[in-house]
UniProtKB/Swiss-Prot annotation:
Family of this protein: Belongs to the OMP decarboxylase family. Type 1 subfamily.
Subunit structure of this chain's protein: Homodimer.
Pfam families: OMPdecase (PF00215)
Catalytic site: K62
Its job: Catalyzes the decarboxylation of orotidine 5'-monophosphate (OMP) to uridine 5'-monophosphate (UMP).
GO CC entries: cytosol
GO biological process, one term: 'de novo' pyrimidine nucleobase biosynthetic process
Alphabetically ordered keywords of this record: Decarboxylase, Lyase, Pyrimidine biosynthesis
Single GO MF annotation: orotidine-5'-phosphate decarboxylase activity
Coiled-coil parts of chain: none
Protein's name in the database: Orotidine 5'-phosphate decarboxylase
């Protein structure tokens, strides 16, 4: 696959276990997501190990800081050679624009830069608790529009918002969707969920899937089944 749609979320606190899992799967069938826990534990060298094995990496650190600090963190991710990196859209348009501008010298080699809208664990009551009275979907659209205006490549959003965002922001604006569960798997702590085929049909470009793959006895088979369902 030239452009694998599945991004496997790695959530390990043991390096040997993580690499043992990675060695069971084929880099042509998926990409890998490294988040805050693993990056804090194992650092940039872990990402380099994944690159050595041929994997594209989504560095999911959700940077959110003043424009100068955030953009320098994004540049550091580009230097590491990751495929995708993200920032919190709620950091504002100036922060996002600075992060996009700092990637210009990398040309076609630059990572995709993605905004994080509303975390998939958040519901209306959670938003109200931080002073946002809009419905989650309305707030997602507001932040996604801000992200596009800042020149970013797309957003992380739940599959429920995908068709709305494609309609408002265009086909080229990339949608990265967590909360994906293959049919029959546990819901876990993601509140707003959908199957892989449903998510792609709704307009998602990339699907973040964790435990249904990482905890499977035969992850390569699960990946094959998911990819087949997307054809």
């Amino acid at each position: 696959m030239n452009d694998p749609k599945v991004i496997v979320a790695l959530d390990y606190d043991n390096l040997a276990d993580a690499l043992a899992f990675v060695d069971k799967i084929d880099p042509s069938t998926c990409r890998l997501k490294v988040g805050k826990e693993m990056f804090t534990l194992f650092g940039p060298d872990f990402v380099r190990e994944l690159h050595k094995r041929g994997f594209s990496v989504f560095l999911d650190l959700k940077f959110h800081d003043i424009p100068n600090t955030c953009s320098k963190a994004v540049k550091a991710a580009a230097e590491l050679g990751v495929w995708m990196v993200n920032v919190h859209a709620s950091g504002g348009e100036r922060m996002m624009a600075a992060s996009r501008e700092i990637l210009e010298p990398y040309g076609k080699e630059r990572p995709l830069l993605i905004g994080v809208t509303v975390l998939t664990s958040m519901e209306s009551a959670d938003l109200q608790g931080i002073g946002i009275l809009s419905a989650p979907q309305d707030h997602v659209l507001r932040l996604a529009t801000l992200t596009k205006n800042a020149g970013l490549d797309g957003v992380v959003c739940s599959a429920q918002e995908a068709s709305l965002l494609k309609q408002h922001l265009g086909r080229e604006f990339k949608l990265v969707t967590p909360g994906i569960r293959p049919a029959g798997s546990e819901q876990g702590d993601q509140r707003r969920i959908m199957t892989p085929a449903q998510a792609i049909a709704s307009g998602s470009d990339y699907l973040v899937i964790g435990r249904p793959i990482t905890q499977a006895a035969h992850p390569e088979v699960v990946l094959e089944e998911i990819n087949s369902s997307l054809v």
